[in-house]
Amino acid sequence: MHYIGAHVSASGGVHNAVENAVAIGANAFALFTKNQKQWKAPPLTEEQISLFKQAMVAHGFSAKQVLPHDSYLINLGNPDPEKREKSVNAFIEEMQRVEQLGLDRLNFHPGAHLKQIDADDSMLLISQGIDSALEQTEGVYAVIETTAGQGSALGRTFEEIARIIERAKHQDRIGVCVDTCHIFAAGYDIRTAEGFASVMDEYERIIGFDRLMGMHLNDAKSTYASRVDRHAPLGDGNLGLAPFKTLMADPRFKNMPLILETTNPDLWSQEIELLRTFGTEKN
């Protein structure tokens, strides 16, 4: 089955994310478990955890349909030891919150070297930060997101992500999330069915579909290989609808959260329906 949804608001309590997903006809969703623009957050209460789990059961959601996202402040590759420690501790807390909610994966941007150290050294710091979080949680996967490579952000290429994974001790609990806008901006041309197939063959060779634990389905306002991260509604950007038709016809993308982060929430229910249509078309 295809699990399709969007990154919905959890304002007023994490359980509201479930209700907000249902309201747009989604059977998957992403959420922040805390304010993504602040370092500290009060711990989840027993009541909040209980309400979330009850909502999940009531609406028939399982962990594999949910792709939580961590705070944008976190940079596991930060060359400054003090700032990096702050990021690692915040990442551990994010992973623990996911575990408390009965979920099994946390999506995150790997980090940036800030042009202060070699990229490879920064990637090693990221690997070590991931290990720290995995050692303090159980049953939760750290899911590395492909990036556009804006600024000094790492994870722009499949090779960089593979490098981060191979230097971690706990590789069995590391997954990957591919963002269609990001990989296009990073230089992977997926605008045609042939291009999409070629890029996914490359992904399989370098990382492997066995690690794929989610997708972010975004059209791109940014141009090809621009290394600029700008999302657009489906069919309204430089990708067009072809890659999404190809993706939805490929059974490898079933049974994982396919998450819209497109720029107009009012269109999400229509975009979900459109993707469902693509998924049922006979080729």
Q: Which positions does each model-derived feature cover?
A:
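N-terminal pre-domain/capping segments
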Residues: 1-70, 74-96, 281-283
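Active-site beta-loop-alpha junctions enriched in small/polar residues
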Residues: 7-11, 34-36, 71-73, 111-113, ...
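Acidic (Asp/Glu)-rich catalytic clusters
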Residues: 19-25, 45-67, 93-102, 131-138, ...
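Conserved, mostly hydrophobic/aromatic
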Residues: 21, 69, 87, 98, ...
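Non-cysteine beta-strand/loop elements that form the S-adenosyl-L-methionine
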Residues: 27-33, 64-68, 174-180, 209-221
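Active-site acidic/histidine proton-transfer and metal-coordination neighborhood
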Residues: 76-175
